[in-house]
Regions:
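Conserved beta-strand-loop-alpha-helix junction that forms the acyl-donor binding cleft
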Residues: 121, 147-157
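Conserved GNAT acetyl-CoA-binding A-motif
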Residues: 137-149
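Conserved catalytic-core motifs of GNAT/GCN5-like acyltransferases
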Residues: 146-149, 161, 166-183
């Protein structure tokens, strides 16, 4: 019997978070990002960054959560980290190129990453990550949230819009190896 749940990330999850991030990007974004860019991403470097995010977040409202699938196999319990979500207060990284940082955004959460490894998809892990994140955001005093998605990432856009998110009109282009990749920002009220 498989059971799925979400918990705060622990330092020993950092390597698995990095592996999931890289594996997911290489599948989900292979038509969005240049292959050589995806091939050159250093998983060990990502793991160090995730260790920092888990052990030394910039504020108490920065969070990293992991989705876990737990299976009982022959009287033993096996747990697999299958996805993760990272978020924090709205900051300059959540701005569009033509926006100024304004103080009225202090109650806005910003999703920096939310990924489920494709082989674990369609089992409710993304929905559990999003629901757990929303619960924490509300507890932290946020009243809305934003998330950037690649224009070409129909799966993420569909997932978020099915959960009540909508584009807020902000756009930007991510510069990857001199290739401008369009993104749009989605938002929701909590």
């Amino acid at each position: 019997v498989a059971v799925g749940f979400v918990r705060p990330a622990r330092p020993d999850d950092a390597g698995e978070i990095a592996r999931i991030q890289l594996a997911t990007w290489r599948v989900a974004y292979r038509r969005v990002l240049p292959k050589h860019v995806l091939d050159e991403i250093d998983e060990a470097f990502l793991a160090l960054r995730w260790t920092d995010a888990v052990t030394a977040p910039p504020t108490a409202r920065h969070r990293v959560l992991v989705a876990v699938e737990q299976n009982a196999v022959e009287q033993a319990v096996q747990e697999y980290v299958v996805g993760f979500a990272a978020s924090g207060p709205f900051d300059d990284g959540a701005l569009a190129a033509d926006e100024d940082h304004t103080p009225d955004r202090e109650n806005v959460a910003a999703v920096t990453d939310m990924l489920v490894e494709p082989r674990w998809g369609r089992r409710g892990h993304g929905s559990r990550l999003l629901a757990a994140s929303v619960d924490l955001w509300r507890g932290d005093g946020f009243d809305s949230a934003v998330c950037w998605a690649f224009d070409a990432d129909a799966a993420t856009r569909k997932f978020l819009t099915s959960a009540g998110w909508a584009p807020d009109g902000a756009t930007r282009a991510l510069d990857v190896d001199d290739l401008l990749i369009p993104q749009l920002r989605l938002h929701t009220t909590l």
